Amino acid sequence: MAAPRESLRRRKAGAGDPEPEAPPGQGRDLKGRPARLRAGTFWLTRIVLLRALAFVYFVAFLVAFHQNKQLIGDRGLLPCRAYLQSVQRHFGGRVSWDALSYAPTILWLLDWSHMDANLDALALLGLGISSFILVSGCANMVLMAALWVLYMSLVNVGQIWYSFGWESQLLETGFLGIFLCPLWTLSALPRGTPTSWVVMWGFRWLIFRIMLGAGLIKIRGDRCWRDLTCMDFHYETQPVPNPVAYFLHRSPWWFHRFETLSNHFLELVVPFFIFLGRRMCIVHGALQVLFQVVLIISGNLSFLNWLTIVPSLACFDDATLGGLFPSGPGRLKDQVLKIQEEETRGARAPRTRGSVARGTVNLALGILVAWLSIPVVLNLLSPRQVMNSSFNPLRIVNTYGAFGSITRERTEVILQGTASANASAPDSAWEDYEFKCKPGDPRRRPCLISPYHHRLDWLMWFAAFQTYEHNEWIIHLAGKLLANDAQALSLLARNPFEGRDPPRWVRGEHYRYKFSRPGGRHAAEGKWWIRRRLGPYFPPLSRQDLRGYFTSRQWPYPEPE
């Protein structure tokens, strides 16, 4: 009987127990499953933010490279050299601090005799830096500051061509992006530089102001936003409609009311979700990203909606965005898990002079943004709210808004030329110039170009609301068409006088445009638009008529090519 009792004692003592299991592998939980990222860190968020911002910068510099010479170059429609000279004269004829602060641009420091080359150099440098960040997902403060300075240098000499709200929005977003990164280190996961909470809240504050500003300007603006009828007109009258807008315009009335109510909810209510804890902040980010995707699908609003997605990404932490990154040993996601495990065990990066300096910089950034936000908040609270304005020359904190008023009908300026000797002769054959994207030929399908942007097409939409006296550049364009100017014609899709002598006369005609009805008679004829002439926009002009006009503005007189 002794033997069984001894065996029992051994079992109780654990002598017969198997060897304990090995600890879980790196990046695995206790059951061997892939470990989940913890909430509250932003290592992966920073990578997504930087890549998204770099993508928008890339598009912006690509637009600049393709169009700046024609718009603000040596022979552009509004030469930036003439603009800088006028600023210089205003401040006493020299490059003073006042001139620099009025129009901050590094072009002040370059040789103005080669302005086209200067503009190309700035755009190409921006394209190169943004491409590197987009591909690698890493950046430092030097590279991000370079992108910001380069784009600010273009915006501040771009005049009316760069007068849109998304230019300031990109500069504010880009300024915050500088402080996402370490000073010199080029690493996707710079261990000594965790993502600053100050910067993340700076982005959240930005998206809050963008959305709330857009919502308030609508409620305070056009009556149709209050009676829920604005979407009855928006798709047809927006600056550059796309093919999806053609079909959305014919949606049932109740769907348009639903769209308007949804817009008010997303712009006036959802922004406050940011301040209601992590889960509601994530809900806010998801709703805003989805909203911007819908806007991208339904219209060509340049890179505005793509840019608005960028600060929305700050609503997500590593636990939320982890699914975007592949798992596996040595992968970014695995490295972040290791960092989180080290922090759980109490391991912290040693406190150095660099970390102290960075903390000081982050504190200064928070104070600066808070101080510059005072007039912006007062503007939001004011019944006389102003949208898309800046209260400082560097455009660090700005006001935003979009579509405070909605036009009820679409009008277009159509440029035409004729080779007839007599412009007023009944048998004069007038031929239309076609732009890259704006409506012209009723049979041409609306374009789909977002996030790209044709600046001339967009300004032609505004010009149709005004007279040509308010838009001198359109007469400059007419003069260039009279000379078959190749540079100006590169902004257009079709020159009816290609391979022929230039026209003797150019005129502007004013038309009203309406979408044809899908399945209707005009659509069956291949027409996307129905147009009706309203009258002349500007009278027939010849090169001789414009000689004095060009001379008084110091524009080069167009000579036929």
UniProtKB/Swiss-Prot annotation:
Membrane topology category: Multi-pass membrane protein
InterPro entries recorded: LMF
Region described as Disordered: 1-32
Localization: Endoplasmic reticulum membrane
TM region positions: 43-65, 121-144, 201-214, 286-314, 361-382
Cytoplasmic side: 1-42, 145-200, 315-360
Keywords of the record: Chaperone, Endoplasmic reticulum, Membrane, Transmembrane, Transmembrane helix
Main subcellular location of this protein, as a coarse class: endoplasmic reticulum
GO biological process: protein maturation; triglyceride metabolic process
Gene Ontology cellular-component terms listed: endoplasmic reticulum membrane
Assembly and interaction partners: Interacts with LPL and SEL1L.
Family: Belongs to the lipase maturation factor family.
Cited function: Involved in the maturation of specific proteins in the endoplasmic reticulum. Required for maturation and transport of active lipoprotein lipase (LPL) through the secretory pathway. Each LMF1 molecule chaperones 50 or more molecules of LPL.
Annotated protein name in UniProt: Lipase maturation factor 1
Organism expressing this protein natively: Bos taurus (Bovine)
Gene that this polypeptide is encoded by: LMF1
